[in-house]
């Protein structure tokens, strides 16, 4: 389990699941072939967390310039980072979404070029936006028609892999925009945790939170059965339930 600090989450350590493994393969394919991919799933199944863990994106990179020396901390961040993560704002015009994307792709490119010890500052500035291999847009359901056109234009211009994350049905909405839909190469449905997988990972989660699960104790087994039944594989519900357990 790897540390992934996200405000508001009780489960600070990321637990690799089968669904994350499938998401990783899907995202890597979008990078390798420079396609647009759609990731859809019910609320709370872990789409956003999977995207954050896959990219290892850190907002500290935003604002990085070509002049100042790259700090050791940011060099470690960019070495582990596989792309930019953008959460579509509730109010999004083409200008807003363009700014949100380019700020991050530029920061990624500048940081990567400096980490690779590129001596030519002009080259760093001019080529920075083209160095980002992947852009993931979370809450893509919020994007307006014009904002989607802007995203498509940036995708064509900079040739990064693109993943759009949203709710079930987002693919039907995109199908109404032929210019965007024709560029979609992959689709992935992010599903809930299976019951078997929940029973496998829960003891690990408990251990990480400083709790002990003993399968020989009836009360522990009964507690596990109750959690499985109540949460039904929804990661957000699992996180909330464990936050209540810790509080008590």
Pin down the residues of each PLM region:
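Mid-core helix/loop region of P-loop NTP-binding domains shared across ATPases and GTPases
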Residues: 78, 89-154, 161, 193-204, ...
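Hydrophobic anchor at the beta1->P-loop junction of P-loop NTPases
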Residues: 39
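Switch/connector loops and helix/strand junctions flanking conserved nucleotide-binding motifs
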Residues: 47-48, 94-95, 170-175, 196-199
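A short, basic N-terminal segment
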Residues: 1-35, 53, 57-82
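C-terminal alpha-helical "lid" subdomain
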Residues: 2-14, 25, 48, 81-82, ...
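Walker A (P-loop) phosphate-binding loop of P-loop NTPases
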Residues: 44
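Sensor-1/coupling segment of RecA-like P-loop NTPase cores
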Residues: 154-178, 188-191
């Amino acid at each position: 389990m790897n540390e992934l600090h996200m405000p508001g989450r009780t489960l600070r350590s990321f637990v690799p699941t089968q669904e994350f493994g499938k998401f990783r393969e899907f995202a890597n394919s979008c990078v390798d072939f420079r396609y647009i991919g759609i990731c859809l799933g019910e609320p709370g199944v872990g789409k956003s967390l999977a995207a954050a863990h896959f990219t290892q994106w850190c907002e500290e990179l935003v604002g990085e310039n070509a002049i100042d020396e790259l700090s050791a901390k940011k060099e470690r961040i960019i070495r582990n980072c596989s792309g930019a993560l953008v959460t579509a704002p509730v109010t999004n015009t083409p200008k807003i979404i363009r700014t949100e994307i380019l700020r991050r792709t530029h920061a990624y490119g500048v940081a990567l070029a400096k980490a690779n010890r590129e001596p030519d500052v002009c080259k760093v500035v001019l080529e920075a936006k083209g160095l980002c291999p992947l852009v993931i847009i979370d809450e893509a359901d919020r994007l307006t028609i014009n904002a989607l056109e802007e995203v498509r234009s940036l995708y064509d211009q900079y040739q990064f892999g693109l993943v759009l994350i949203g709710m079930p049905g987002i693919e039907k909405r995109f199908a109404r925009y032929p210019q965007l839909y024709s560029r979609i190469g992959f689709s992935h449905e992010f599903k809930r945790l299976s019951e078997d997988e929940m029973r496998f990972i829960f003891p690990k989660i408990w251990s990480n939170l400083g709790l002990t699960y003993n399968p020989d104790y009836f009360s522990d087994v009964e507690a596990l059965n109750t959690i499985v039944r109540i949460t039904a594989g929804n990661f957000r519900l699992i996180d909330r339930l464990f936050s209540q357990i810790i509080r008590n």
